[in-house]
Amino acid sequence: MDLSIIVIGASGRMGKTIIQVAQEQGIIIDAVIDRPTRLTSLASYNIASDSEPDKIFSRYPQAVVIDFTTPETSISMAQVAQKYGNPIIIGTTGFTLEQFDTLETLAKTSRIFWSPNMSIGINVLLKTLPQMAQILGNEYNIEIVEVHHNKKKDAPSGTAMRIAETLSTSRHWDLEKVACYNREGIVGERPQEQIGIQTIRGGDVVGVHTIYFIGPGERIEITHQADSRKNFAQGALKAAEWIIKQKAGRLYTMMDII
């Protein structure tokens, strides 16, 4: 089956990058969706465009929807995609627990793929970090620092939270109890069962995540640096190629691919 896609938020940074990479790879772009005020800026693509997903999804029910927008928009798009049978790839972060529950419920009857970071490198890291945490043991304190551009709306990043969740699970900790997002004043000694998660925002940084394992007399630093949004787009398109061969039933992630 030939891959064809529908890009949501096509005038945004990720939307433009997805279109560019898809064109470079010869992938068919059936349509784009954006706000009414932004549709004129998309005319140069010579692709079907609209602000109403029902009109587009019903016209291209086999196309894979790719969405890197906002939690509210992503939920709405997933609901419309379910209606017409479109698979959907979601790279949005910042979901509330209730919103994420909605996604998981929708995934029982429609094909939904979600990842807070579509980078292959980050997901390989997520797969290997638990082993490091277990081997090093609790004597090695875990700290996470993430850096992103000044336009990013959510903090900490979805990727930082996914890293923290992965590491806390590997040590059988409850992340809600051990996460530390801020230290100020006289906070006392650092508890052994704690994961620090710090956020930096500035400039046009695409994304940097550093994980520290700090032990007696030594420190291990692991850094993933995204130099271009193209790697996120490539990951999303890889997911799109994969999901058209899958069945509904659960929420898929990059862990299912790598």
Curated annotation (Swiss-Prot):
PROSITE patterns: DAPB. One of its GO terms (molecular function) is NAD binding. One of its GO terms (cellular component) is cytoplasm. Its EC number is 1.17.1.8. It is found in: Cytoplasm. The keyword Cytoplasm applies. NAD(+) binds at G9, A10, S11, G12, R13, M14, G91, T92, T93, S115, P116, N117, M118. Signal peptide: none annotated. One of its GO terms (biological process) is lysine biosynthetic process via diaminopimelate. Keywords: Amino-acid biosynthesis, Cytoplasm, Diaminopimelate biosynthesis, Lysine biosynthesis, NAD, NADP, Oxidoreductase. It catalyses: (S)-2,3,4,5-tetrahydrodipicolinate + NAD(+) + H2O = (2S,4S)-4-hydroxy-2,3,4,5-tetrahydrodipicolinate + NADH + H(+); (S)-2,3,4,5-tetrahydrodipicolinate + NADP(+) + H2O = (2S,4S)-4-hydroxy-2,3,4,5-tetrahydrodipicolinate + NADPH + H(+). It comes from the Bacteria. Belongs to the DapB family. This is 4-hydroxy-tetrahydrodipicolinate reductase. It comes from Lawsonia intracellularis (strain PHE/MN1-00). The gene is dapB.
